[in-house]
Each structure stands twice: as C-alpha cells, then as structure tokens.
C-alpha cells in the first residue's frame, strides 16, 4: 500500500496521484510566470511550485484536477514542500473519484448530528432553542459537509461540524466549572458562530470564497440570518440581539474581524473556546506529521512557530 503524502519525510522520493486543491499564479524574479499549487490526499496537503508555466499549462493544472506527480520532499525555510520533477494530469482509467483524495473529519456525520441535537435539546430558553434549531435545520446539509476554513484549521470535509462538536464539549466542561454562565447562550453561540461559512465558502472540495463571502464575510452573513430567522419565527426578544452580538464579536477584536469586542460574558468565553479549539487542531495536525525529538514545520497562523515533539511522546 502506497504511503500518503503526509507520511513522506524530507529527502524521500515521491511518485503519487494527488488532487490540486488550489493553484495560484505568480511572477518570478526573472519575469517568468509560475504556479503555486497545493496538492492533497486524505492525509493532508503540501505546497509545490511549477516553474516557467505557459498559458496552456496554467489551464491544465487548476483546482479539482487529479495529477500524477514525481519529485522529492524538501524543507524550505521551515516549511515542507514537494519539489516537482514530473507532473501530468491523471487519465480517467487511473483514478476513481475526487472524494478519495480529500481529508475528512475523523467522526461520522451521523454521530455529530446526534451530539449537536442533544445539546440543542438541553436548552431551556425556548427563544434560543427555536432560533438555533431553525437555523441549523435550514443549513444542515452544507453544515455537515463544509470545512471550517480554507486554510489553517479544520480545513477538511465536515471540518465545520467537527469544530462545533469539539467546541460544544469544551463549552459544557467550562459551564460545569463556572455555573454562572448561561449554557443556552453559550451552546447556541457555538453552533451559530461559524454557520455563515456555508454561504461564505464555495463547498467542501477546493474551497474558495463566494461573492457573498468576499463582500460580506461569515460574521455579517450570520447576523443577518439570525435576524431573518427571528422574523420568520415571530420572536421579538432580547435573546435575538444577544445572539447576534455573540456571533458578531466572536473573533474578539476589530483587527481580527469582529466589528465589536465581546461585551457579554458568554461572548467572551465563546471567543476563547473558538480560539483554543482552532489552535489545538493546528498543533495536533502539525505534530501528527512529526517524529518525537523533532520540530514541526512552521505554523503560519501560530506566529510562524515550530513546535517540538518530546521524545517521550510516541
């Protein structure tokens, strides 16, 4: 059985089928065009460069194209890359389905639905429960398929739902430790905070930003969705405004994408939970590709740091 791309080490030769996740055009210092491609399989992704590309080649190597690649793995300025020696578009008889090349959440969709439904069932505030259930039902199919982001954390199929389930478990543990927290508000905030990404993002494979995503962003989208849901359900209560604020402020600061900072206790806690789960996912995935006694590649979203894996962590 062939190794997956994340299992290769620096210096090893590669000859595999991979899916182009993204392809971005650039211009080298010599004035010649090149492509930066992100290649993926179910284990993760890796960056590669295609130099001196012609317009015809650019049209060949686009997102959602399966390619046969030969080359070697190298460490370039702390980041793992694939140096391409040969590349071609795969023939139809060589590969089966694009879905065979994408990373997926480690939990079944049915199990995640069951868990999230249980958290909604535990809500005691009828306004919060109805709003949350209504919005989740409206977007459930996409919610269970979409990633949580295009890069950095939970950027895999069903990553959005997996991120939410992990955050709900964190919210429950924190609420048990601090009983003054409104669990209904916190659980609803967790479920709704990134739900706008089903409109912001294009889909589960080769994910990009939609027009709405580029012009509005998932935070503004979800604030509007909560308002529409309240109108549809004839809910005219303060809970609507507080839920909108929780979504609006969950990035914490204006420079991080939130127009308002958290001004409600549950909004502040949601920001911490979101940040913690995202960073844990980044570290776990980077360390999962690292041997004990070695450092990870640099993690851009974590201040470009490399994390050490202790020798006693087998």
Swiss-Prot record:
Keyword entries, A-Z: Exonuclease, Hydrolase, Nuclease
Pfam families recorded: HD, tRNA_anti-codon
Molecular functions per Gene Ontology: 3'-5'-RNA exonuclease activity; nucleic acid binding
Alphabetical list of CDD domains matching this protein: HDc (cd00077), YhaM_OBF_like (cd04492)
The protein's Enzyme Commission number: 3.1.-.-
Domain HD: 163-279
Enzyme class: hydrolase
GO BP field: rRNA 3'-end processing
Top-level taxon in the UniProt lineage: Bacteria
Family listed: Belongs to the YhaM family.
PANTHER family xrefs: 3'-5' EXORIBONUCLEASE YHAM
Protein's job: Shows a 3'-5' exoribonuclease activity.
Protein name as catalogued: 3'-5' exoribonuclease YhaM
């Amino acid at each position: 059985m062939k190794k997956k791309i994340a299992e290769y080490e620096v210096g090893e030769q590669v000859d595999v089928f991979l899916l182009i996740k993204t392809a971005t055009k650039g211009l080298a210092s010599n004035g010649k065009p090149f492509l930066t491609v992100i290649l993926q399989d179910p284990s993760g992704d890796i960056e590669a460069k295609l130099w001196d590309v012609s317009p015809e080649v650019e049209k060949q190597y686009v997102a959602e194209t399966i390619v046969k690649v030969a080359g070697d793995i190298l460490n370039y300025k702390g980041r793992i890359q694939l140096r391409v020696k040969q590349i071609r578009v795969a023939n139809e008889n060589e590969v089966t389905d694009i879905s065979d090349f994408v990373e997926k959440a480690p939990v079944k969709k049915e199990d995640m639905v069951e868990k999230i439904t249980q958290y909604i069932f535990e809500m005691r505030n009828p306004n919060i429960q109805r709003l949350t259930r209504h919005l989740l039902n409206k977007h459930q199919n996409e919610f269970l398929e979409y990633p949580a982001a295009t890069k950095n954390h939970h950027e895999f199929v069903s990553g959005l739902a997996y991120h939410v389930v992990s955050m709900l478990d964190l919210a429950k543990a924190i609420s048990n430790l601090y009983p003054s927290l409104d669990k209904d508000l916190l659980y609803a905030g967790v479920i709704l905070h990134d739900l706008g990404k089903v409109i912001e993002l294009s889909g589960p494979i080769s994910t990009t930003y939609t027009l709405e995503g580029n012009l509005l962003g998932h935070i503004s989208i979800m604030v509007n969705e909560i308002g529409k849901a309240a109108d549809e359900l004839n809910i005219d209560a303060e809970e609507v405004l507080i839920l909108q604020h929780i979504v609006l402020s969950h990035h914490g600061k204006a420079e991080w994408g939130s127009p308002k900072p958290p001004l409600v206790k549950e909004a502040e806690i949601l920001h911490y939970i979101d940040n913690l789960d995202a960073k844990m996912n980044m570290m776990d995935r980077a360390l999962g590709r690292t041997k004990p006694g070695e450092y990870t590649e640099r993690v851009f979203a974590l201040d470009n740091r490399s994390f050490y894996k202790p020798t006693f962590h087998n």
